[in-house]
Amino acid sequence: MARLNEQAMSSVALSTDNLELLRRKFLRQNRDIARVNSTQSLRIRGLENECARLLSENLELRGQVLRLEKELQDNAARRVADHALEVKAKMETQLAELSSLLASLGEPPSKRRLSEERRYAQPRPSVHRSPPLRRARQEADQELLAEQEGRLPPIYENKTYARATMNSEEILALCMQADDSNDSPDIGPPPVSRFVEDDMVIPCSPSPNKNAEAEETETTEQVEESPRALQVPPSLSPPKLDYDRRPNMILFSPPKESRVAEPSKMFSPPPMEPPKQSTSAVPSETIRAGLKRKLNGDNQNEPNKATKLQQGKENGNETGIKKGLSARDPHKRKSIKETATKPRAPLSAKSTNEHIVSPKKPAKPHQVADDFKPVKVHKASKGKEKVDLPAPDKKSAVEETQGNSTSAFTKVEILPPALEPTPEVAEIPETDILITPGTPERASESTVVTHDTPPPAHISSNGETSRPSRRARAAISYTEPNLRDKMRRPTKELFDAVSGEGKFLHRPTSQQQQQQRKGDESAPTSVSKVKVEPSPAVDISSLTSSALFEKEKEKEPQPDEGILSPNGILPSSVDLGRRRRASSFSTAAPAMTIPSVQEQSTLNLPAADETDENAAVEAQIQKELSNSITTRPRGGKGRQSMSRSVPTIPTENYEHEDAQLSTNSASVDLYDFASCASPDSAAPQLEATTGDVPVNKKAPKGSRRASSAASTETTATASAKPRSSRKRASMLVPKKSLWAEELAQEEEDEEDVGNDSGGSLSKGRASRRRSMML
């Protein structure tokens, strides 16, 4: 045992030694590994530093490469620029040589002095010019030469001296003349030439002047429609220089010294000379072909040329004015200044076509003398007013305008076509275009104008744009007859547009409506209190005593039955009494009750024997109804239907009740608002009969059947009638619950009335009848 223990102890000691050795070995290895790691980490750090250094060197090298490349490019560009500069310098030297060669080309011969050569060779600056007086003289000479040779004068630029044309006052005077002139402001005056002296005009060929005179008298009115008249007014156009295009006139311009005094001379009015009228035969002269303002060759008034001119000579001053305006030779031109209302302003426009007036719409109709009006115009006028002034007024107007000729700024005014002699108007061939029966005033106004080209047909002289009809017709009013006038009748009744007035409708007649209106006017309209006051009943015994009434009792009324029978007798469905307003039907108060079937049936009984028979029948009906009445609380489960029948009541009585119900329901016009009485008039309905019956009492079975039959008949008749009220049918038809309660109350009343004497029965019926009539 002891050896065994020793061996165990020895094995334990060996194991502990081995573990110690292993621990030391591991520690030594760990130290080696840590040393290797440290050396490796140091080496890694060194390599990283080397990489960073190499990268920085690489960047530096790249920057250097880029810098060198840029230097190369700059060197290349510099070389190109240097070459261009060299070429430029060479070209400048060559251009200098060429300019010297060109400068030597314009030199005068070498005989003259060098100073003169240099002075002429160098370009003269704009400052060193000739003095203004010498330049003005040269310009005046050049203008005079141009006028004599028929050329246009030269146009100078950059003038430093004052212009010799018009100042601001003259321009303002021209503007005022343009406003006061008879020319149209839209089209403008005819073309003019300025600075034309009457004394400087020398006629070269007298025969064209005569031809021009005859030609211009013909074309006095033709140029109004000419497109050449569309010129700018003189106030807007630039001032023109003094030249004239007429080849038959030789114009002279005064020298420069005389132009200074020219405005003062022009301000004074020219001397007036008496007009010289030509005595030669003007109609035989021909028209010159080369007229400046050429117009349409086809003159519509050519056959009347000779007669117009002859009549113009006979008229004295007026013809002299017109001839003075149309003359062209210098002797005839003197008459222009006489006939002008004002002397011409200095340097103002002098028209070459002085006889032409631009088209302008007249402010008022032309005044034509009564002596020279055409006969057809008088026939066409037919009583219309026309403003006619005699011929002496025109002469006085011309004299007034001549009296005003001493104003400062004047112009040659051309007389309007309204002041022309009127014998020409009478000889115009009257056509359908000028004179029509429907347009008398326009015909007389249009005959004054003697255009070669007439104005458009759709525009008259007064600016009207439509031609009226040939015949004067009366004005047609489309507002009458009105629909209200078509539908109006002798009375104020309204008829149904669908069914028509010829069909018999359930409406009260005009007499009934008058009675109802009288009752409505007398009755108050307040609904404050319900009073029991009997009102006088209408006696309908005379209407219900016939045989027709018996037939009406047996059958139900049809909805299309007429108001009057063929014999002229009112049927039983007509109620002549006053009816209650619809508001009394719609209220649910127990005091407002509708008369029962028995009360309504008593209204139609005419005689005493018939009332006794019906009283016996009603007593029997009331007894059987009272036996079958079963009351039930209002909140019960099973409510009996309104159409449930009672087997104890005989069918004859039901038929009689249905007939009476239908007749009375048909007599009530549900849609007649005017026929309904006020609640005060409908109030007396025997409140004593309603006091015994509780409000929430169940209606009897028999009364339910009767009320259902009555309601169906009422709705049937109401659907066939036209509406003439503002109330709806559902508001006017009596409610079924009200019918049931009222029937139950009336049945109890009938039992009480049956026990009374015959006199009390008749009194109660009479009072019920009165209440029903209300």
Swiss-Prot record:
Keywords, alphabetical: Cell cycle, Cell division, Centromere, Chromosome, Chromosome partition, Coiled coil, Nucleus
Compositional bias of kind Basic residues: 765-774
Biased segments, Basic and acidic residues type: 109-120, 382-398, 482-495, 549-558
GO biological-process terms attached to the record: cell division; chromatin organization; meiotic chromosome segregation
Biased composition (Low complexity): 706-722
Disulfide bond sites: none
Function: Plays a central role in chromosome cohesion during cell division by preventing premature dissociation of cohesin complex from centromeres after prophase, when most of cohesin complex dissociates from chromosomes arms.
Protein's UniProt name: Shugoshin
Species: Neurospora crassa (strain ATCC 24698 / 74-OR23-1A / CBS 708.71 / DSM 1257 / FGSC 987)
